[in-house]
């Protein structure tokens, strides 16, 4: 059974373990500090955990840039659960939640050349690309 729930401070250790499993393919080790800062800020209110078979399998959230713009943030899944639809469920959950906000006009995200095609499935469009932007020299895709 799959459930999605709000993140709790006690989830951090498990999320760090899953984050580390995504290094170096999807994240650089330097990004872990940024993720921890994000998680330990007030953004935890809009950060969600996906559990599969009673175990945390990934997370995703969003942060408001202003009343009209939100950013999808820190989407990652345990590599052992990639291609099982968990990332899709989690992103859809965040997008459905955001779409209920009548003041919101824009949902955007920053991703890489490795994952932008995943977000195109949700109708995100590439606005611009910055070459070798991320610490591991992957390109930034702003969508």
Question: At which residue positions do the language-model features occur?
Answer:
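Conserved catalytic-core motifs of GNAT/GCN5-like acyltransferases
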Residues: 106-110, 120, 125-142
